[in-house]
């Protein structure tokens, strides 16, 4: 197995395994636990997305990478819905406070903002052809929303003191940020080189 696949599996698998061994689970109900792990998986999927679109995962062609990016995006939406629905079932007042930005917890607004950005990207992806969005326009819209998703998701995760183990959580968040910065830098470099090539003609 190529090292990058092994590193990806560890970056996502270790935090999940560490959370599964948390003593705090003893005081949590099954729905709350499901919601929590859906949140961890969602952050793991956020890590996969830039790796796919940047073509960094060996064995995947550009076409397969884009297709996988779309499917992982759908899985991310499902994970977020399970996360939010589970928390709503276990504590409706807390979720109402979070969704209305009235929660006293510092991590709530970042999670809510990231959630709406994820839903916005998913909706636009579904309606892209109907709206007649060109690839360039789609990227202009998608990139800022992706940044919001990454920043909001990472801050939401880091500020929560829950079942996730501190070090593995920090490593996962750092990996998400690093992958996002890497793909953005590479895309910017490609556009710059393409612009220079066109200007020379």
Language model: regions and residue ranges:
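Membrane-embedded alpha-helical bundles that constitute the cytochrome b-like, heme-associated redox core
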Residues: 1-201
């Amino acid at each position: 197995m190529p090292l990058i696949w092994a590193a990806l599996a560890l970056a996502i698998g270790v935090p999940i395994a560490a959370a599964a061994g948390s003593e705090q689970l003893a005081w949590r109900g099954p729905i709350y636990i499901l919601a929590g792990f859906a949140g961890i998986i969602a952050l793991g999927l956020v890590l996969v997305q830039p790796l796919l679109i940047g073509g960094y995962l060996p064995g995947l062609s550009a076409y397969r990478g884009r297709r996988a990016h779309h499917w992982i995006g759908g899985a991310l939406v499902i994970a977020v819905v399970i996360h939010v629905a589970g928390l709503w079932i276990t504590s409706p007042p807390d979720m109402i406070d979070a969704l209305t930005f009235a929660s006293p917890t510092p991590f709530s607004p970042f999670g809510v903002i990231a959630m709406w950005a994820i839903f916005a990207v998913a909706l636009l992806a579904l309606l892209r052809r109907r709206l007649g969005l060109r690839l360039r326009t789609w990227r202009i819209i998608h990139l800022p929303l992706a940044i919001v998703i990454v920043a909001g998701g990472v801050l939401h995760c880091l500020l929560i003191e829950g079942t996730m183990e501190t070090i593995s959580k920090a490593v996962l968040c750092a990996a998400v940020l690093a992958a996002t910065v890497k793909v953005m830098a590479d895309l910017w470099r490609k556009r710059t080189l393409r612009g220079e090539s066109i200007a020379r003609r």
